[in-house]
Each structure stands twice: as C-alpha cells, then as structure tokens.
Amino acid sequence: GSHSYRHANLGKMDQAAQQADQAAADALFQEVLGTTPALLRPPYGSMNKTLKTTSGRSIVTWSIDTEDWRSKDADKVVTGVENAGNLDGQVILLHSIYESTVAATEVLVPWLLEQGYQLVTVSELIQLRFGDEVEPNRTYNYDYFRFQVPPLPAETVPAAA
C-alpha cells in the first residue's frame, strides 16, 4: 500500500491536492513496481470525507500505536507490544525509518511467531480473519480491527432447522 508521496496531512487537503499527491505516488509505484497500490495508509492517520469517498483506495489505519516515532526506544516499543494483550487480528503501527523500530522488529517478529501469531498483509487479514474482500473507498480502522467479530468457521455454524 501507499503512505502518500509527500507525507503530508491528507485530512487537511482538498480533493485536488489529495489527487495530485496520490498521482505522484502512483507514478513512482508504477515506475518501480509496475503496478499501483490498492491500499492507502494516510500519514498521521488523518483523513477527511473527501479522501474516504474519492480516493479509490481502501484506507487502512491501525489498532495498536506503538508511538515508536515519539520514543525512538526499541525496548519501549517491544514492551508496549508485548503488553498490548491479545494481538489476534490487530494492525500494529511501526515506522521503518527509525533504527530503534527496526531493532524492535527484529525482537518482535520472532516473539510473535513464538506466541503462535501468523504475520500477514492487511489484505490477507481482512479476508482471512474477517471474511471481507478489500473494497475501494472503505475505511479499515481501529474500530474495524478491534471490535469487528470474525465470522464463525463453517463447521461451527449451526445448520438451519
């Protein structure tokens, strides 16, 4: 997914500015990867109604904010995730631009796997955990990841009488 081109606050932009930023990001994705992303994680999690309804992207935020950008402390990031409770179906916000976050990730990935978690893309999470297809102009945010009840597996659904 995209995180925008200029890392500007998309929620404070009008539609023309949002589209210009998205077009610049799309051009770069197309040049480097040969495709454009279907997902957008807006910087700061900031969005407005215009972005939600006209971006043509699925907008994804997070359900656990490590605040790695604030502390820049690997140990605090690790402890925060380890103490966050049940992480099943959660999206953990991390910023790879900080060395401390990279160091925290080197600890967290093995720990998460040892705890039995499976690491998947956001699209896979939405489909596998919640049974939804990723839809353009839909927002997947804290409430979606924290409070959406996953569907029961087919074998546990009672048969109709």
Tell where the protein language model's regions lie, with residue ranges.
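Surface-exposed helix-capping loop/turn segments at secondary-structure junctions
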Residues: E31-P37, G116-L119
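C-terminal domain-boundary segment and adjacent tail
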Residues: S100-A161
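A short, structure-level motif marking secondary-structure boundaries and short turns
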Residues: L10-G11, I92-L94, P150
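Alpha-helical scaffold elements lining the catalytic groove of polysaccharide deacetylases
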Residues: A8-T35, S46-D88, T101-A104
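Structural recognition of the beta-strand scaffold that forms the well-ordered cores
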Residues: G1-S4, A38-P42, S58-S63, Q90-L94, ...
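Periplasmic/luminal catalytic loop of GT-C fold multi-pass membrane glycosyltransferases
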Residues: D88-H95, T101, L112
